[in-house]
Structures are given as structure tokens and as C-alpha cells.
Amino acid sequence: MAENQNCARMTRAAAKRKASSMALDENPVSKKRVVLGELPNMSNVVAVPNQERETLKAKTSVNTSKRQMKKALMIPEASVLIESRSVDPQMCEPFASDICAYLREMEGKPKHRPLPDYIEKVQSDLTPHMRAVLVDWLVEVAEEYKLVSDTLYLTISYVDRFLSVKPINRQKLQLVGVSAMLIASRKYEEIGPPKVEDFCYITDNTFTKQEVVSMEADILLALQFELGSPTIKTFLRRFTRVAQEDFKDSQLQIEFLCCYLSELSMLDYTCVKYLPSLLSASAVFLARFIIRPKQHPWNQMLEEYTKYKAADLQVCVGIIHDLYLSRRGNTLEAVRNKYKQHKYKCVATMPVSPELPLAFFEDITIRGMA
């Protein structure tokens, strides 16, 4: 008897499945193959039959028009609109303006800043050139191990902050560099960060594993485990999005050029005193000037978004311009060789005027000069 009931239930279930498949055959839902990244970020996506879809469209259009009427009086700033178009989840577009304000506040806190003159005040055995050689070498190490750019910028930040509080001798400077990169890589290189042995090897085994681990602990204590400070890259990621708005034909070029100029700025000890946001804005200013030398590199949107006027950038832009022309740091080759590669659009070889027009830095209200 039980077997007969089971058979009956199975027969009814089979009949339902057959009826469902026949209904789907009559109203087939078109499908297409999509890349995983293009899939909507929804866990409850279902296939809707065509007839129901038309009804939903009508309801949606009514609701949309109501929402548009409600939002008509709330016109966001142009820079917020740019953020809202971002598909990068790291940009967190619903909270973009709040995040920018928080980063600007955070970058200026003393615990996140190196001393602007730590070599003169704290270090007795180091020179600005030694620091520049270390930074240039760390750029090469980051390329060798294919580390993300955030790791490199954070490494230099850790080095400068550590040297601001702990005097060392020159023989330990390279050890500080690799130990700082080890910390930064563990923060950003989520998949397969380099091991301690890799950093020992890259120094030609000048330092042992125990020395690297010990210096890592010293750096963490000196920084009081404050490892999330904003870097030039933090702001560059956002500023370049605005800078690309009227450079539609050369978006990759301006992005790589901004990165190149930012890495050049890290070579120069003079730039330690500038906030990351100022260095980032200066890189954007100079990159736009290099690509289009006859067009004003700054405009109202950039001023509004970066919170810097062109006049605020003049000295910093001049330093990076000298670095680009090898008037400063001309013996350092790693950064320049990196950006001479085709994968970076050979931006290190782009010609630039030896002089920056002073008119571009006049503190005036810029309107529509994009």
C-alpha cells in the first residue's frame, strides 16, 4: 500500500515537472553568457516570464518617475557624480564624499605623519641621497615580486615614519626597507605575499631571517601598530578619475603618468613634508600639463574635488617637474626604467617643456578652462 502511495506521489511530481518544462518551452527566457564580474550583485535573481516582465516594466517606470521627481531638487556636485559612476567597489560610491573627508582628516594626524626634517633632527648617519637610493631599490623589489602599488607606497610611508622616531646606522637602512615592505605586503598582498626568506634573498642574504623578523617587530612598535595611514596612491586613485573626465582619448596614459610622477616624488626627501593629497594633486596637475601643454591643467572641478587651488601646488609641481627632467635624482634609474616599458605606455619618455608657465598657477577662479 505504501509503495502504491509513493508511486502516486512520484507520478504527480513528474507530471508537475513536465508541465513546468512545457510552459517554459512556450515562453523561453533568453540567456547569455556573462563574465562573472558583470553579474548583478544580487542573490535573489530569478527568471521572469515575458508577460510578467512587461507588467513589471510598467510599474517600474511609474516608480522611477516618482523617484526622479523627488530627487529633482537634490543635484549632487560634479565630483560626487564622477564617484557614483565608478564600478570599483573600493571607491564605495554611496559614501564617497564622507570617505574623502575622513581621509583628508586622517592624513594630517601627527601619528600618521613623518617628521619633515627627520634626517637632520633624528638621523646622524643617514643622508637624503641614501634614502633616495633605498626608495629606488624598493621600487625595483616591488617590480621583481609583482607587488601591488599600494604595498610600495605604504612601505615608503612606514620607512619615513620609523626613521622619524628611531635613529639607525646606514648599514641597517636596507634592513628597515625590506622589513617595512614585509609588513606592507602582509597588509595588501592577500594572495601569496613574499616570505621572509624572499626578502633575505633579495638582499643577497646580507640579513638573516631573525634580523628581518626582529626589525619588523621594532617597526610595528615604533608605529604603534598604526598601519592604515593614507598614502599618495589612496588619493591618486580618486583624483585621476576626475582628471580623466576631459581626457577621454588618453585615460590610461594619464593614469600611468600620474603613477610615474608620484613614484618620482617619493625619491625626493623634500617631498616628505607634503601631505599625500597634495603630492597626488600635484602629480595630476603635471600629468595633464605634459599631455596637453597648451591647455590649462587645472579646472573648477579638480579644484573643487581635490580642495587645492593651482597656486597651492606650485612648489610641489616644480619639484616633481625637476625630477621628471632629471634635474634632481638623475642617478636613480629604477623608477624611470619601470615606466619606460610598453605596459606603462612608455610615459617616462614623453617630452615636456623645461619651463612651467607661471600663468597656470595664478590664484584666480578658474571657469570652464578644461
UniProtKB/Swiss-Prot annotation:
SUPFAM superfamilies, per this entry? Cyclin-like (SSF47954)
Listed GO MF terms: cyclin-dependent protein serine/threonine kinase regulator activity
The biological processes this protein is annotated with in GO are: cell division; mitotic cell cycle phase transition
Tell me the keywords, alphabetical order. Cell cycle, Cell division, Cyclin
Which terms in the GO cellular component ontology are assigned?
Answer: nucleus
Which CDD domains does the record cross-reference, listed alphabetically? CYCLIN_AtCycA-like_rpt2 (cd20506), CYCLIN_AtCycA_like_rpt1 (cd20562)
UniProt cross-references to SMART domains, sorted A to Z: CYCLIN (SM00385), Cyclin_C (SM01332)
Assembly, per entry:
Interacts with FZR2/CCS52A1, FZR1/CCS52A2 and FZR3/CCS52B.
Q: What family is this protein classified in?
A: Belongs to the cyclin family. Cyclin AB subfamily.
Protein name as it appears in the record: Cyclin-A3-4
